[in-house]
């Protein structure tokens, strides 16, 4: 599944290269530094039907962070293709970014596990190293008595909504 994720990134990157010129040309305009995700956090469990919050801090010395790419790997043994979600980064956050993305989770009759992969791309076409988050989405019958998802460490992340992760999770296969 990670291979599919990387192939999809390569295709998106190739399309960007053909439209905007080569990497050297874009680096002349936007700079040679790439984005770095400096801190990240997400709760390891969330109740079905709740929004899962994924916190990130990132920086780029050139100030040209442009998009957040997200993909989902379903629980082991289930090969369900999900699209890649692309969230635009606001220009005032191109140098330093802090906040959370949110992924809607389905109401469930059984728990599922997913892995979320995140990367940031800048306008020159550089990608950050990926970060991975595993989460258990538990069903409504087990939700009673469970606490809300974990909060991030205090003082590390801004409580700023960076946007939704536009992937609709489903438990249906095929």
Model-predicted regions and their roles:
Residues 50-54:
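Structural beta-strand segments of beta-rich domains
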Residues 44-49:
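Short, solvent-exposed loop/linker segments at the N-terminal edge
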Residues 20-36:
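Proline/serine/threonine-rich low-complexity linkers at boundaries of modular beta-sandwich domains
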Residues 105-112:
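Surface-exposed, short loops/turns at beta-strand junctions within beta-sandwich domains
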Residues 57-63:
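Extracellular acidic, Ser/Thr/Pro-rich low-complexity tracts
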Residues 126-171:
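Short beta-strand elements
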Residues 89-103:
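Aromatic sugar-binding surface patches on proteins
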């Amino acid at each position: 599944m990670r291979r599919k994720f990387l192939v999809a990134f390569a295709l998106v990157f190739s399309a960007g290269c053909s439209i905007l010129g080569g990497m050297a040309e874009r680096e002349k305009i936007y700079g040679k530094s790439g984005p770095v995700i400096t801190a990240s956090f997400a709760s390891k469990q969330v109740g079905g039907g709740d929004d899962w919050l994924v916190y990130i801090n990132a920086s780029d010395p050139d100030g040209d962070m442009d998009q957040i790419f997200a993909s989902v790997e379903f629980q082991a043994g289930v090969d369900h293709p999900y699209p890649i979600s692309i969230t635009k980064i606001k220009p005032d956050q191109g140098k330093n970014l802090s906040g959370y993305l949110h992924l809607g989770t389905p109401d469930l009759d059984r728990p599922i596990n997913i892995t979320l992969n995140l990367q940031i791309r800048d306008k020159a076409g550089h990608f950050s190293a990926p970060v991975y988050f595993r989460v258990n989405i538990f069903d409504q019958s087990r939700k009673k008595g469970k606490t809300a998802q974990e909060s991030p460490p205090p003082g590390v992340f801004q409580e700023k909504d960076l946007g939704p992760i536009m992937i609709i999770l489903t438990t249906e296969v095929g």
